[in-house]
Amino acid sequence: MEAAYRKEADCMIVPMPREVDHHVAGNMSREIDLLAESWHVHRIVFDFAGTDFMDSSGIGILIGRKKTMDMHAGKVTAVNLGERVYKIFEK
């Protein structure tokens, strides 16, 4: 998945997969952490444009990266939330 990630200035763009569940969460978290550190980013943008399903593992990815970014005065943003994914954040 790493090839899909990209850096723009001090921002890391993370295109989220179609399904975000426990099968992808662990690897994604590790990859994002490693790249964010090596790229010295201060913002991570999670792009949900292509995501149809997300369970609590996906929430864990975002919360874990937010904690990391908070320690470095950075930010985490979620964009292009479809209706199904948005409902998870509403609750």
Where is each model-derived feature located?
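STAS-typified acidic loop motif
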Residues: 2-30, 48-49
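Short, charge-rich amphipathic segments
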Residues: 1-2, 40
